[in-house]
């Protein structure tokens, strides 16, 4: 069975065609600048040259038409006919409170997605456009939506309700939702498998540390808390996002410094975090290099990030009344020996003991804790596309 996984952004589209018999990606591609000058598609597949197309694409339907063409291209394609695509899985950022798991695309589901669009105005509209484009081009192929928020719907009220008037939650659905759920779900299942344990017997802290970053507390296979909130802005210090901040800073920026609400939104989402504090970059490698050369701001930025991760690890150990394993995943979590080392330093009193030699690895499933460490430490590469494909197979097979 072949599943096409699609992740639509406002002017971009990522895709993978996955053979679910082997769970290998037959092709991986990216379409950029949809609706803009210089629109292009790049596709990679094993044993074939990289395929690049520069061609005008007025909308996502044009983009998906090109994707389908690339997949069956005589020279660069990986399948002979579109009939070999058995299902399509769409990443959707926000499923609101209604969806605690993935769902088959129906008229009712599409209406719900439209309603959730106000909760994720930067993402859900693009996701919806992608689904409609696929429906127009491949009307007979079953489609599934996989939500970033779904995995976190098991959180209890004490974790997701904000201490605002309760009617704002009841009427306006203002609450913590959490994001990166597909990644947290994937790596928590993978670590249970790697340890040879039943996930229902484990207390797991998953650290998805990339340009966007979040941590989840997973007890007996269910998420009980996570760092991102009503939007992906809450929680950790991130590449360009500020993370937790006194909400009164927002009103101060508007009332005293003359910012508009949109300017504050842009400031906190795109100009803050590691990038804003360091003044260098949102790329940890660049900021680490600047800190090594004596940049005070770069060092402060790194310290803020590391401290925010440490604080949540401590909090989640308390919240779950213990922890069996901490998992590092995503770009920084999988690849940064420096950041993992700095985060785990001085946590021995909690039973967290990093092995410096074992930590000298990148992007593979590996234990990095010392023998005898009470809380195990692991690196587990995430694979959100495979998780989406697995959910898609599970739903269409029902």
From Swiss-Prot:
UniProt EC number: 2.7.2.1
Chief subcellular location: cytoplasm
Catalytic activity from the UniProt record: acetate + ATP = acetyl phosphate + ADP
InterPro entries hit by this protein: Ac/propionate_kinase, Aliphatic_acid_kin_short-chain, Aliphatic_acid_kinase_CS, ATPase_NBD
GO cellular component, one term: cytoplasm
Cofactor needs: Mg(2+); Mn(2+)
Keywords annotated in UniProt: ATP-binding, Cytoplasm, Kinase, Magnesium, Metal-binding, Nucleotide-binding, Transferase
List of catalytic residues: 148
Binding site for Mg(2+): 7, 384
Sites annotated Transition state stabilizer: 180, 241
Binding residue positions for substrate: 91
Subcellular location(s) of the protein: Cytoplasm
Pfam families linked: Acetate_kinase
Enzyme class: transferase
Record-linked NCBIfam families: ackA
Function: Catalyzes the formation of acetyl phosphate from acetate and ATP. Can also catalyze the reverse reaction.
The protein, known as: Acetate kinase 2
């Amino acid at each position: 069975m072949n599943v096409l996984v699609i992740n639509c952004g406002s002017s971009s589209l990522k895709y993978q065609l996955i053979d679910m018999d082997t769970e290998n990606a037959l092709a991986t591609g990216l379409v950029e600048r949809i609706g803009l000058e210089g629109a292009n598609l790049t596709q990679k597949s094993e044993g074939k040259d990289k395929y690049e197309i520069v061609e005008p694409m007025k909308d996502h339907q044009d983009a998906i038409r090109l994707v389908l063409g690339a997949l069956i291209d005589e020279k660069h394609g990986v399948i002979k006919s579109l009939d070999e695509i058995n299902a399509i899985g769409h990443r959707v950022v926000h499923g609101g409170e209604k969806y605690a798991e993935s769902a088959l695309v129906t008229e009712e589901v599409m209406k719900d997605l439209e309603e959730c669009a106000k909760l994720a105005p930067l993402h859900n509209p693009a996701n919806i456009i992608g689904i409609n484009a696929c429906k127009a081009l491949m009307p007979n192929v079953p489609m599934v939506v996989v939500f970033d928020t779904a995995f976190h719907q098991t959180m209890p009220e004490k974790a997701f309700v904000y201490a605002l008037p309760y009617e704002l939650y009841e009427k306006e659905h203002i609450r913590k939702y959490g994001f990166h759920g597909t990644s947290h779900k994937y790596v928590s299942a993978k670590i249970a498998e790697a340890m040879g344990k039943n996930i229902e017997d484990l207390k797991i802290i998953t650290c998805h540390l990339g340009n966007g970053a979040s941590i989840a507390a997973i007890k007996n296979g269910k998420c009980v808390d996570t760092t991102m909130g009503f939007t992906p802005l809450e929680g950790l210090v991130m590449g360009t996002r500020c993370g937790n901040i006194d909400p009164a800073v927002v009103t101060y920026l508007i009332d005293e410094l003359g910012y508009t609400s949109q300017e504050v939104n842009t400031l906190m989402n795109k100009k803050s975090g590691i990038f804003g504090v360091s003044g260098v970059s949102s790329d940890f490698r660049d900021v680490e290099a600047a800190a090594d050369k004596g940049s005070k701001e770069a060092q402060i930025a790194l310290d803020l990030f590391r401290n925010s991760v440490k604080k949540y690890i401590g909090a989640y150990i308390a919240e779950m009344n213990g922890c069996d394993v901490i998992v590092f995943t995503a770009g920084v979590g999988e690849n940064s020996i420096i950041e993992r080392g700095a985060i785990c330093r001085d946590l021995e009193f909690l039973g967290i003991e990093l092995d410096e030699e074992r930590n000298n690895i990148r992007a593979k499933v590996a234990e990095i804790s010392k023998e005898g460490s009470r809380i195990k430490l692991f690196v587990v590469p995430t694979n959100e596309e495979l998780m989406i494909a697995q959910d898609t197979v599970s739903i269409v097979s029902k």
